[in-house]
Amino acid sequence: MDYLDLGPYSSASGTVRLPGSKSISNRVLLLAALAEGDTTITNLLDSDDTRVMLDALGKLGVKLARDGDTCVVTGTRGAFTAKTADLFLGNAGTAVRPLTAALAINGGDYRVHGVPRMHERPIGDLVDGLRQIGAQIDYEQNEGFPPLRIRPATISVDAPIRVRGDVSSQFLTALLMTLPLVKAKDGRSIVEIDGELISKPYIDITIRLMARFGVNVEREGWQRFTVPAGVRYRSPGRIMVEGDASSASYFLAAGALGGGPLRVEGVGRASIQGDVGFAHALMQMGANVTMGDDWIEVRGIGHDHGKLEPIDMDFNLIPDAAMTIAVAALFANGTSTLRNIASWRVKETDRIAAMATELRKVGATVEEGADYLVVTPPAALTPNAAIDTYDDHRMAMCFSLVSLGGVPVRINDPKCVGKTFPDYFDRFAALAKA
């Protein structure tokens, strides 16, 4: 098996310019493809997940011109020209869910599939929502999961669409992004959420980006959303993708554990991403954090004892960045509890089970629940642990931080970081010092 040995390191400092946000990149690509006019996207993330979105849009007849991290997208004015396509979307939830909705109203014959893990990630609540407006979608294998067959259908919105909010916020994102293109009585579509909506900051990203393309969604709390119907997205001309706040979390944690100063550029106070909230969680644990509009800097830990404080927190709003907290908890002077993280179980892998297994390898005592994790750090980290990454980019990036505990660590299958951050380990090694 391919592996990478890291550390032992005793410090980390420097500056890192973040790659573009995955969540923003794939939303902007789809909005630009559906809009009227040409959109120049800058700082577009180059990774597995954005590549599958670009490949899919190309197969659907969208004209794309790429040059480095810039892409010019010629909009289709609301309808893809290709009426048949077989789309392989890897393990990219940010591509599968929104594209499924866009294709369901496009009047064509499409197949949507991915890697085996994607076929274990739920999509039934989105399909149920789309069927409420007339979509013809069939499951090829297991009910509620890809692969999907999408067929031409007569689409109309005659009543509020109900969708569950407690599995993935991407179902709501997919509906919100597609509904402006559908005619509805009263000139508007309404989406109502059953249960608690998780990952609310990701919905905020969706709504803000739709507004950049000229469509304004109104919301009543987080339970009811009103979308103008039968309208066109209009290109904003140019749009810059801000840095990936989830990716920032590893470097910010490294700045705390390795003394810093370590600065990330590309996200800050002005970010539209909820995962900048990671910086506040890190502050709560005692890290010295300062922020500008588009940068965050960490300078070690503010306690004489040099350890982080344990944390007990609800991470429903920032589930991806919370993984970094789970590994940072190895460096706390007590037991930490991560709550309300049930969504981890349906991500790239079952992240609660995977995290518990790998934390134990480095000596932690871990209690795992349906939607929580309790981490008690060891007196000393176990050196030379071989960390399995489960084809999950975030597992690989999180566990690089163990090397800052003065012990070497082995990361198996390090190339899985290609999903969002292909050169992560090069960037990390440039900042970490023995």
From Swiss-Prot:
EC numbers, comma separated: 2.5.1.19
Predominant place of localization: cytoplasm
Transmembrane region(s): none
Record's subcellular location: Cytoplasm
Entry keyword set: Amino-acid biosynthesis, Aromatic amino acid biosynthesis, Cytoplasm, Transferase
Binding site for phosphoenolpyruvate: 22, 93, 121, 170, 351, 394, 419
This protein's record includes keyword Cytoplasm: yes
Pathway field: Metabolic intermediate biosynthesis; chorismate biosynthesis; chorismate from D-erythrose 4-phosphate and phosphoenolpyruvate: step 6/7
Biological process according to GO: amino acid biosynthetic process; aromatic amino acid family biosynthetic process; chorismate biosynthetic process
Entry keyword Amino-acid biosynthesis: yes
Known function: Catalyzes the transfer of the enolpyruvyl moiety of phosphoenolpyruvate (PEP) to the 5-hydroxyl of shikimate-3-phosphate (S3P) to produce enolpyruvyl shikimate-3-phosphate and inorganic phosphate.
Family: Belongs to the EPSP synthase family.
NCBIfam families per the UniProt record, alphabetical: aroA
Subunit relationships: Monomer.
Protein name: 3-phosphoshikimate 1-carboxyvinyltransferase
Organism: Burkholderia multivorans (strain ATCC 17616 / 249)
